[in-house]
Amino acid sequence: MSNWLVDKLIPSIMRSEVKKSSVPEGLWHKCPSCEAVLYRPELEKTLDVCPKCNHHMRIGARARIDIFLDAEGRTELGADLEPVDRLKFRDGKKYKDRLVAAQKQTGEKDALVSMSGTLLGMPVVVSAFEFSFMGGSMGAIVGERFVRAANYALENRCPMVCFSASGGARMQEALISLMQMAKTSAVLARLREEGIPFISVLTDPVYGGVSASLAMLGDVIVGEPKALIGFAGPRVIEQTVREKLPEGFQRSEFLLEHGAIDLIIDRRELRPRLGNLLAQLTGKPTPKFVAAPIEPIVVPPVPANV
């Protein structure tokens, strides 16, 4: 082996490997919209909204609930419920194996988390879809957890808020999943009859049986900026009607312009704005919102290998 190989090349490779390993996993994140490389702790301060282009990144169900509800007094509803493969469904993979994989990936039993708590001191119940669990698809457990949350709102006469992020009904549960559309719609009709507010927040994306049922039944329907909202996807529609769709079709801004939703609210403003809205709808005093102090973060230089 030549002296050049021993003295120059091998130490250079070793230094490169040391540099790579010194960057902790997940410390940097690339924005899918503007491709800016963002420091993860700084991104968490902005609630996963890109500080460069305002792109609202997808976040999990528990993260949504955590940034929305007050820290104290939370109780999860329907946590004991688990999905069952009653139909022994199999496509390219057994449904029960898909469930196990999704549960391992997300740490959740199914694609909806429901929790009671307070928003700026006001009692409220919240449901949030976990899109990483089989695309946030709605099956029997998702439907039952939503109904339990709505029943809690009925029993305690408190408002309900739902954050939707779903591809629609879960095909592996066939008619059982389609039945959840009627089941969730029926319980929301009871809320309306009792005069209990239901606010639906549409996040990216909301499609299929969820958009055709509970997601579009809010007394007030709110969209996050640039969220994709529809029944079938744009490509499916274009192939069916054989026409080019308008620019931005199915984005929340397009839906707001055409009267399909009521508001678009930045994720960082959801707590105070929905708090004020719920206070008006329930006749309660306007709550005081005190923003948490923002601690300065020293952002290190972006590593060359990121």
From Swiss-Prot:
Biological process (GO), any one:
malonyl-CoA biosynthetic process
Instruction: Give the cofactor note.
Output: Binds 1 zinc ion per subunit.
How is the subunit organization of this protein annotated in UniProt? Acetyl-CoA carboxylase is a heterohexamer composed of biotin carboxyl carrier protein (AccB), biotin carboxylase (AccC) and two subunits each of ACCase subunit alpha (AccA) and ACCase subunit beta (AccD).
Which keywords annotate this record? ATP-binding, Cytoplasm, Fatty acid biosynthesis, Fatty acid metabolism, Lipid biosynthesis, Lipid metabolism, Metal-binding, Nucleotide-binding, Transferase, Zinc, Zinc-finger
User: Boundaries of each CoA carboxyltransferase N-terminal domain copy?
Assistant: 27-296
Q: Which family does it belong to?
A: Belongs to the AccD/PCCB family.
**So what does this one do?**
Component of the acetyl coenzyme A carboxylase (ACC) complex. Biotin carboxylase (BC) catalyzes the carboxylation of biotin on its carrier protein (BCCP) and then the CO(2) group is transferred by the transcarboxylase to acetyl-CoA to form malonyl-CoA.
User: Does Zinc appear among the keywords?
Assistant: yes
Q: What is its main location?
A: cytoplasm
**Which Gene Ontology CC terms are recorded?**
acetate CoA-transferase complex
Upper lineage ranks?
Answer: Bacteria, Pseudomonadati, Pseudomonadota, Gammaproteobacteria, Pseudomonadales
Q: What is this protein called?
A: Acetyl-coenzyme A carboxylase carboxyl transferase subunit beta
Q: What is its EC number?
A: 2.1.3.15
Q: Spell out the molecular function terms from Gene Ontology.
A: acetyl-CoA carboxylase activity; ATP binding; carboxyl- or carbamoyltransferase activity; zinc ion binding
Name the cofactor(s): Zn(2+)
Residues the record lists as binding Zn(2+):
31, 34, 50, 53
Keyword DNA damage attributed? no
* Top-level taxon of the source organism: Bacteria
Annotated localization: Cytoplasm
For this protein, the record's HAMAP family field holds:
AcetylCoA_CT_beta
- Zn finger (C4-type) ranges are 31-53
Q: In which pathway does it act?
A: Lipid metabolism; malonyl-CoA biosynthesis; malonyl-CoA from acetyl-CoA: step 1/1
**Catalytic reactions of this protein:** N(6)-carboxybiotinyl-L-lysyl-[protein] + acetyl-CoA = N(6)-biotinyl-L-lysyl-[protein] + malonyl-CoA
